């Protein structure tokens, strides 16, 4: 497992980071639509929903880029998992309350005609992405990342770092 773990971590970084970059980029051009998408969940005061509609795309881009380059993998993995859990809570409450909205996960969002809302697919996707974030939090040392892999210990409590 030790030889495959860094490769699995690389795949997890690229999938999770690439997804976050795509989501952030697609919202970045139309932040007003991102705000509409967040408001459609009817969870937060309008001013906070508008704020998150602007901040989340920047956050997704930043965390996604850090994951792809392999910088701060443990913390960005944890932040990604928390973000996905937040998305899952928002989507679940919209579904439970019978709201008819598009999740706005990759741009767009807001109200949709009755019967056109799809909650299961985004929930399954976000669950998988959250699991990738948890994996990276637990196993942050991956191939081709900027984070340093710790040197193997030579004796109890010593390392090769000098």
Question: What residue ranges belong to the model's regions?
Answer:
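Solvent-exposed, well-ordered loop and adjacent helix/strand elements within mature globular domains
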Residues: 23-56
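Short hydrophobic/aromatic-rich motifs at helix boundaries and adjacent loops
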Residues: 6-10, 35-38, 61-62
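Extended, low-polarity transmembrane helix blocks
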Residues: 1-29, 69-162
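Hydrophobic alpha-helical transmembrane segments
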Residues: 51-69
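A generic alpha-helix propensity feature with a strong bias for hydrophobic helices
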Residues: 48, 60, 153-155
């Amino acid at each position: 497992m030790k030889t495959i773990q860094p490769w699995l971590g690389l795949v997890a970084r690229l999938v999770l980071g690439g997804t976050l970059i795509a989501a952030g980029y697609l919202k970045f051009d139309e932040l007003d639509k991102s705000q509409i998408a967040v408001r459609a969940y009817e969870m937060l005061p309008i001013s906070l929903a508008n704020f998150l509609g602007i901040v989340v795309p920047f956050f997704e881009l930043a965390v996604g880029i850090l994951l792809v380059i392999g910088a701060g993998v443990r913390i960005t993995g944890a932040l990604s998992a928390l973000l996905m859990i937040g998305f899952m809570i928002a989507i679940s409450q919209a579904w439970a309350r019978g709201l008819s909205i598009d999740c706005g996960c990759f741009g767009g969002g807001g109200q949709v005609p009755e019967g056109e809302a799809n909650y299961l697919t985004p929930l399954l996707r976000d669950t998988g992405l959250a699991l990738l974030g948890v994996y990276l939090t637990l196993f942050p040392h991956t191939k081709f990342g900027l984070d340093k892999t710790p040197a193997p210990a030579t004796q109890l409590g010593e390392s090769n770092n000098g």
